[in-house]
């Protein structure tokens, strides 16, 4: 029985890779063991799991299409960017029921110009904290959130974990720094906005909802920190 089962699993993975590649491009989907390995374990080595494939979208639209596909085909999704967490939240679960992919946000690393009047920028979820800092400092400002993993940790991850860091007592956590956020729900619906409005009277205030949600509610793709 092992032969047919293995063949079936290979066929499912092949079809999954083909479908994901049609969304983000073949160069940004891989299922081979060597390339997956760096995404299947956290940097401490304590938490590991196996994914069927890794997909690296370039923008919110591609994230939305990936999530819609996975939702429709019962494929689990693990969101990952800098992979600097210490509790295994960014790697596949070893006891997962069914196939899963790692959704890497590293390519969502664009940053807009600093708006001196609002003191905010538009940053992709995959932008590192260090790049956010550099942009702010060029404009004569600094970031209220800072921590040792700044060169690898990302804006999206910092929001999802509601990170604080060494300046948290003075400035608060990421929840206090973000005025706008763009995210994608599990079914591919894009929510939120990247406006500078401190309060919205229509619908949910997505920065407050998603800060600290650890990826359980939506995938953050961009923000206004």
Task: Specify the residue positions occupied by each region the protein language model found.
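FAD-binding subdomain of flavoenzyme oxidoreductases
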Residues: 110-225
